C-alpha cells in the first residue's frame, strides 16, 4: 500500500491498495455516484435522501476543498486499473475521535473492496493520528457492515437510539498491537 500526503488528504490518490485507490472525487464520478446514491440496495442503510446530479456536482466541488485537518470529508474509492468509481468513504475528525462511514456501489458488493480499502485507511489513520479512536455507525439491520467491522476488530459499544445505529469502536492500541499484523500482509510505504 502506498500512502501520499500527511493530514492534508488533498493529494490524490491518498491510499493505493492492490486493486483500489482512495482519492478525491472527480467530475467524471458523477454518473456512477448518482446511480448508487439513488439505488435502494445502497441507500437502505444510509441517512441520505435521493440526490440530484446538480446536488452531487456541487458536493464534489465542495469536497475537493476539504481536508481531514479541519473538516469532515468524503473521498472516492476507485478501481486502480481504470479509475472507475466503486464507492466512497466519509471521514470526520473531532478531538481524539475519527468517525468513518463507507458505501460501496451495489454492483461491487461481495468482492472484498470495502475490507481492502478500510483496512488500509485504518492503518493510514492510526499512523497519522496517534492515540485516536475510530468510530463507525451502522444500521442495526446491516449485517454485512457489522460483519466487516468485527472482522477488522471493531467492537460494538451498543445501540444509539437517537441515531438508530450500532456504534462500533476501534482503539489505536488494539489495532497497533495485533490487528494490523493479522489483517494486513502488505508492506507500507509512506510518502510525506
Named regions from a protein language model:
Residues 41-62, 73:
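Conserved GNAT-fold acetyl-CoA-binding loop/helix
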Residues 65-70:
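Short loop/turn motifs at secondary-structure junctions and domain boundaries
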Residues 1-44, 74-192:
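Acyl-donor (CoA/ACP) binding surface of acyl/acetyltransferases
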Residues 8-9, 61-63:
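A generic local structural motif
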Amino acid at each position: 500500500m502506498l500512502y501520499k500526503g500527511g493530514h492534508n488528504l488533498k493529494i490524490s490518490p491518498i491510499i493505493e491498495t492492490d486493486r483500489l485507490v482512495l482519492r478525491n472525487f472527480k467530475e467524471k464520478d458523477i454518473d456512477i455516484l448518482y446511480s448508487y446514491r439513488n439505488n435502494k440496495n445502497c441507500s437502505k442503510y444510509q441517512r441520505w435522501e435521493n440526490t440530484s446530479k446538480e446536488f452531487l456536482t456541487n458536493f464534489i466541488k465542495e469536497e475537493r476543498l476539504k481536508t481531514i485537518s479541519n473538516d469532515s470529508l468524503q473521498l472516492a474509492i476507485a478501481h486502480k486499473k481504470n479509475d472507475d468509481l466503486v464507492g466512497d468513504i466519509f471521514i470526520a475528525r473531532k478531538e481524539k475521535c475519527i468517525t468513518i462511514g463507507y458505501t460501496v456501489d451495489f454492483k461491487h458488493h461481495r468482492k472484498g473492496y470495502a475490507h481492502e480499502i478500510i483496512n488500509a485507511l485504518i492503518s493510514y489513520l492510526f499512523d497519522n493520528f496517534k492515540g485516536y479512536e475510530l468510530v463507525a455507525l451502522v444500521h442495526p439491520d446491516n449485517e454485512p457492515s457489522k460483519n466487516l467491522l468485527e472482522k477488522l476488530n471493531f467492537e460494538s459499544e451498543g445501540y444509539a437510539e437517537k441515531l438508530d445505529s450500532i456504534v462500533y469502536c476501534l482503539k489505536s492500541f488494539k489495532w497497533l498491537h495485533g490487528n494490523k499484523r493479522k489483517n494486513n500482509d502488505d508492506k507500507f510505504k509512506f510518502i510525506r
